[in-house]
UniProtKB/Swiss-Prot annotation:
Binding-site positions, UDP-N-acetyl-alpha-D-glucosamine: T15, G16, G17, N127, R163, S191, I249, Q294
Enzyme class: transferase
Designated name of the protein: UDP-N-acetylglucosamine--N-acetylmuramyl-(pentapeptide) pyrophosphoryl-undecaprenol N-acetylglucosamine transferase
One of the record's GO molecular function terms: UDP-N-acetyl-D-glucosamine:N-acetylmuramoyl-L-alanyl-D-glutamyl-meso-2,6-diaminopimelyl-D-alanyl-D-alanine-diphosphoundecaprenol 4-beta-N-acetylglucosaminlytransferase activity
GO terms classed as biological process: carbohydrate metabolic process; cell division; cell wall organization; lipid glycosylation; peptidoglycan biosynthetic process; regulation of cell shape
Cysteine-cysteine disulfides: none
Organism: Burkholderia cenocepacia (strain HI2424)
Length: 367
């Protein structure tokens, strides 16, 4: 670190929905010459993932209360005080010019201590319904940013920071116009899989006449790939050229760009990535998400005719097959164009610029 080098502290943890957008901003700031240090929980996924990106870490031990027992709730005051003390120690060691909170329970004690120590705090909320931590910290932050309009009052709509390769794909009209033949459908269950999609999609395809069937790439999640193969075999399909089953997809930008339609859950980052690429989507929100935020995430696009939203309780093989029969590449291309129009592909740069400005830095360094 040079005497003139500025420092960003990113605080985020718990899930990929918090960590991955934080990493996108971290790399953007590093590219502009900033030093970045990450504040996370030693028990969280960030403790393994972030160091692989070459970013040094500070640790705070603090967890949530949802679904926890009486003992955890009774010890909350002690644990919170300890986490605040650990956060203050990290702030004193790192001496950041600005702190960016991307969500997760550890951001609460660290955010409070950031504000009390007089350092500028910038918050970013990834979901359409703000979590409790960000609702409280928003009152202490210098700038509040949201991925979906209206998630927090008086916030700036920047979109979700995403990987650069997702933000710079070919426009939908060019991609769709270059294709012919059966529709290309990508089914994404996420890293953990989505049992409802893994069960319904094969049965829906079996209800379609051979000439109506799309080409399918179905990502199942590592733990679910064998069960998915069994589901397709039971529906009369053998994995081959028109049905490709995979446990994981390394290059999501290429997978999205090759698809005419994506069938998936509606986590915040998934919705943001699909909009950035510009691809038609049928969202089936995870019904047990906190505050049902996946439904409102999907509704942001669905209400604009940029996607279709089907609740899991309503999803059936018959419904999906009937809907697929009514789609054409042209209708899906129209949906993709509407989706792209609602995207914020420059969100990573915008969040980085806000952080720089909060620190009193020259924005030209982020051009």
């Amino acid at each position: 670190m040079t005497a003139s080098q500025r420092t960003l502290m990113v605080m985020a943890g718990g899930t990929g929905g918090h960590v991955f957008p934080g990493l996108a901003v971290a790399h953007r700031m590093e590219a502009a010459g900033w030093r970045v240090v990450w504040l996370g929980n030693p028990a969280g996924m960030e403790a393994t993932l972030v160091p692989k990106h070459g970013i040094p870490m500070e640790y705070v031990r603090f967890g949530g209360l949802r679904g926890k027992g009486l003992k955890t709730k009774l010890t909350l005051p002690v644990n919170l005080l300890r986490a605040c003390w650990q956060s203050l120690g990290a702030l004193r060691r790192v001496r950041p010019d600005v702190v960016l909170g991307m969500g997760g329970y550890i951001t609460f004690p660290a955010g409070v201590m950031t504000a009390l120590s007089g350092r500028p705090l910038v918050l970013h909320e990834q979901n359409s319904i703000a979590g409790l931590t960000n609702k409280v910290l928003a009152k202490l932050a210098k700038r509040v940013l949201v991925a979906f309009p209206g998630a927090l009052p008086h916030a700036e709509w920047t979109g979700n920071p995403i990987r650069a390769e997702l933000a710079h794909t070919e426009p939908p009209h060019a991609r769709y116009a270059s294709r012919s033949g059966p529709l290309n459908v990508l089914v994404v269950g996420g890293s953990l899989g989505a049992a409802a999609l893994n069960e319904v999609v094969p049965r829906a395809l079996a209800l379609l006449a051979p000439g109506e069937r799309p080409r399918v790439v179905h990502q199942a999640g590592v733990k679910h790939i064998e069960a998915l193969k069994a589901n397709y075999e039971a529906a009369g399909f053998a994995a081959g050229e028109d049905v490709r089953l995979v446990p994981f997809i390394d290059d999501m930008a290429a997978a999205y760009a090759a698809a005419d339609l994506v069938i998936c859950r509606s986590g915040a980052m998934t919705v943001s990535e699909i909009a950035a690429v510009g691809v038609a989507a049928l969202f089936v929100p995870f019904p047990y998400a906190v505050d049902d935020h996946q439904t409102t995430n999907a509704a942001f696009l669905a209400e604009a005719g940029a996607a279709v939203l089907v609740q899991q309780r309503d999803l059936s093989a018959e419904l999906l097959a009937d809907w697929l029969r009514g789609q054409s590449r042209a209708s899906l291309a129209d949906m993709a164009e509407r989706s792209r129009a609602l995207a914020k592909p420059e969100a990573t740069d915008e969040v980085a610029r806000v952080c720089a400005k909060a620190a009193g830095a020259n924005l030209e360094t982020l051009q």
